């Protein structure tokens, strides 16, 4: 079984970011070995990620180093992609 690595590009006070974070936490409850890392949009690493991937504002979700979703994130599509990357649907 493959354990996906999730990175959430977020920002303080960002309501859509909180929604995506909640969804990822629920998914983590279902898949305890899921690795979720938060990166602050305004940090040096966040700025590098956003420039490299043309992310103009948070949130953005990366799956195994590749952008999965950004901006207005479709939760269902995100969940399906994470489950599929894990080898379960």
Describe the residue ranges of each PLM region.
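Hydrophobic residues in alpha-helical membrane-spanning segments
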Residues: 17, 33, 59-60
């Amino acid at each position: 079984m493959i354990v996906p690595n999730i990175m959430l590009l977020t920002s303080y006070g960002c309501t859509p970011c909180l929604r995506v974070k909640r969804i990822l936490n629920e998914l983590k409850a279902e898949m305890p070995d899921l690795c979720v890392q938060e990166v602050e949009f305004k940090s040096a690493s966040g700025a590098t990620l956003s420039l490299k991937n043309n992310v103009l504002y948070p949130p953005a979700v990366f799956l195994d180093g590749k952008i999965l979703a950004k901006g207005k994130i479709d939760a269902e599509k995100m969940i399906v992609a994470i489950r599929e990357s894990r080898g379960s649907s």
